[in-house]
């Protein structure tokens, strides 16, 4: 998170009562910690205490009467004020979006003039990278599934948080497994939101910063997220590197690969199910050092109807936060038998 001058919108006359803000709480990703504290310091801390983590929050300005908000955190002994946070650029999705949508229409857009190329924005649990915004058509262009996240489907109405540079980070260190409660107390020129009126956001720490990035640009038989396959399962992917991806242009999930983070392994799990979703067989493979894997149809169980593929990275016992997971059908299950003989009789 870079140092920026706080943005305060023009205050218009109206109700100056502090209102509850729509907000998002998150365990701070590695890239944000690097920008906040420097990579050497962060890496040293994680080397000594790999399970430590930090928490943050971003909030949407309720109206122009609101100046900023205070982040309050409860680690079990009651709420303490931890830091201030500036309200972030925000919007809502006008329509549902799928895995592939990199341009989509927004509504309820506020303060998008603050966003710059490569700024991180978040929709639900997916981090995207800002590319551009057409203010006339309200169309946002992004890169999908950045850093330790993967592309997800999002429903219309989902909130878009442009929290890069506009969030509050608690500088206390927490450990994996700790359960925290966070609140954003908004401030106007004459009022502060009561603690009891602010929405509680619960968060469980999971060692996010130390975990390797997942594989990206995963294809099954040369397709992204296919609904079915008809023959051998051919999986391809590219690698990501948490330590390397700390500057320059942000890589989206569909971009090319980089050298994998040192000491990181790539594991593949293929599970076969019959028509009743009963597990028939599970095959696991260490595919480190490669970028493709073929599972022959002849090696599949005769009654296989659906297949689940999980592709993940592991380093020093820590799995990636968001592995690639996809389930699809084996269409040959529905094929007509090829070895039937017929007898024709005259009537």
Each predicted region: which residue ranges?
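Interface-prone segments of viral and bacterial extracellular assemblies
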Residues: 1-347
């Amino acid at each position: 998170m870079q140092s920026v001058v706080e943005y305060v919108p023009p205050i218009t006359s109206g109700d100056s009562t502090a209102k509850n803000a729509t907000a998002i709480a998150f365990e701070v990703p590695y890239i944000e910690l690097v920008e906040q504290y420097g990579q050497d310091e962060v890496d040293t801390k994680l080397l000594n205490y790999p399970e430590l983590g930090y928490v943050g929050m971003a909030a949407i300005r309720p109206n122009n009467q609101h100046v900023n908000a205070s982040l309050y955190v409860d680690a079990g002994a009651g709420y303490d004020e931890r830091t201030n946070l500036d309200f972030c650029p925000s919007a809502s999705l006008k329509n549902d979006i799928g895995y592939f949508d990199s341009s989509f229409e927004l509504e309820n857009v506020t303060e998008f003039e603050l966003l710059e190329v490569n700024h991180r924005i978040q929709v639900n649990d997916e981090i995207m990278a800002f590319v551009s915004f057409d203010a006339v058509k309200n169309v946002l262009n992004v890169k999908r599934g950045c850093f330790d996240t993967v592309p997800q489907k999002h429903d219309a109405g989902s909130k878009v948080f442009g929290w890069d540079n506009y969030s509050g980070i608690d500088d206390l260190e927490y450990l994996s497994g700790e359960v925290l409660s966070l609140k954003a107390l908004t401030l106007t020129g004459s009022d502060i939101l009561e603690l009891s009126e602010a929405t509680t956001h619960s968060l469980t720490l999971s060692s996010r910063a130390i975990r390797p990035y997942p594989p990206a640009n995963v294809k099954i038989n040369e397709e992204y997220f296919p609904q079915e396959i008809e023959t051998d399962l051919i999986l391809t992917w590219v690698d990501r590197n948490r330590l390397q991806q700390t500057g320059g242009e942000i890589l989206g999930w569909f971009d090319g690969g980089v050298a994998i983070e040192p000491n990181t392994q790539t594991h593949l799990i293929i599970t076969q199910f019959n028509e009743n979703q009963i597990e028939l067989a599970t095959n696991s493979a260490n595919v480190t050092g490669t970028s493709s894997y073929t599972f022959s149809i002849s090696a599949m169980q005769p009654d296989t109807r659906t297949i689940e593929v999980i592709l993940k990275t592991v380093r020093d016992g820590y799995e990636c936060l968001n592995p690639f997971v996809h389930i699809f059908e084996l269409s040959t299950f529905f094929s007509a038998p090829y070895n039937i003989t017929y007898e024709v009789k005259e009537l």
